[in-house]
Amino acid sequence: MKNQTPCRVSKITTITQNKRVRYEYFIEQEFEAGISLLGWEVKSLRAGIVHINDSYILLKDSEAFLLGATLRPLIVASSHILYSPMRSRKLLLRRRELDTLLGKVHRKGYTIVPISLYWRNSLAKIQLGIAKGKKQYDKRHCIKEREWLLNKARITKLVHR
């Protein structure tokens, strides 16, 4: 019998989600990227004081950067560190993923949006989506579907009592 090594199970803990992005955009494809962070930023992520609602991804010189994300620093006694909560943070992607993102954004008119921020085995990761903006009637249709699902759940709950 062969020695079988147990496969590693990755533990995922969500830090924050951008709930508005599913309402505003059609998500075509999703990617996972690492984030280059400073020490105080990691502590802020662990405390959960981060907002990615108004953030976006900028592709520059074949690199991806997260702009507009707010990581508030913890209140600590250290005064020698200059905190910049709105600084741009480099995203760590493979070359093939970057080429895919660049091609979709430049040729087809897509945009790249952050969907969620989470821990995967003690590494901070961000889920990116290649997205196309929704029109107003698409948003209304989405609201109608969501309300219908809620009403349907209420009706079936009442029937099965």
From Swiss-Prot:
Keywords: Cytoplasm, RNA-binding. It is found in: Cytoplasm. CDD domains: SmpB (cd09294). SUPFAM superfamilies: Small protein B (SmpB) (SSF74982). GO terms for biological process: trans-translation. InterPro entries: SmpB, SsrA-bd_prot, SsrA-bd_prot_CS. GO terms for cellular component: cytosol. One of its GO terms (molecular function) is RNA binding. Belongs to the SmpB family. Required for rescue of stalled ribosomes mediated by trans-translation. Binds to transfer-messenger RNA (tmRNA), required for stable association of tmRNA with ribosomes. tmRNA and SmpB together mimic tRNA shape, replacing the anticodon stem-loop with SmpB. tmRNA is encoded by the ssrA gene; the 2 termini fold to resemble tRNA(Ala) and it encodes a 'tag peptide', a short internal open reading frame. During trans-translation Ala-aminoacylated tmRNA acts like a tRNA, entering the A-site of stalled ribosomes, displacing the stalled mRNA. This is SsrA-binding protein. It comes from Baumannia cicadellinicola subsp. Homalodisca coagulata. The gene is smpB.
